[in-house]
Amino acid sequence: MENYKGLNAKYIRSESGGGRWEYLKKFPEEWVISYDDLRFKIKPMGFKHTGLFPEQAVNWDIMRGLIKNAGRPISVLNLFAYTGGATVACLAAGASVCHVDASKGMVERAGENVRLSGLGDKPVRYIIDDCVKFVRREIKRGHKYDAIIM
């Protein structure tokens, strides 16, 4: 892996299933990146993730196009929503979003990403809960959404 040009860090997996980051150059603890008009905080975590899955950007583009062209308000249920890449994209396109994840820390980071993108005043509900249990309660309540992201 050291042969990669410009390599700044590498992830070393442990036998127990976790791992650690090894920094080859001075590296910030966290930083902000931009994708179009969206902004996200990146922070390497102990389970190999950085808080964002950039390969999902093509899906964010599709969602944004569908929402913008719907011609009516769209409500989105984002399940297992992590740090909110899809939530930010949908809010930026004009949707209202219900963001659900079991991890309080990830939901807090999603809120931070929403605010970083200048969308803090947009209609979003943050729910810290088991997604399956939440969906069962939503069905009992008769609450429906135009789109569900998983």
Language model feature labels by segment:
Residues 96-101:
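Conserved SAM-binding motif I beta-strand of class I
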Residues 54-72:
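Conserved alpha-helix/loop element of class I SAM-dependent methyltransferases that forms part
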Residues 1-54, 61:
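Non-catalytic substrate-recognition/targeting regions of SAM-dependent transferases
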Residues 87, 145-150:
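Conserved active-site beta-strand-loop modules that form the wall/rim of enzyme catalytic pockets
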Residues 71-82:
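Conserved class I S-adenosyl-L-methionine
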Residues 83-95:
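Conserved SAM-binding loop of SAM-dependent methyltransferases across substrates and taxa
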Residues 75-77, 127, 148-150:
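Residue-level marker for buried hydrophobic side chains located in beta-strands
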Residues 103-147:
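S-adenosyl-L-methionine
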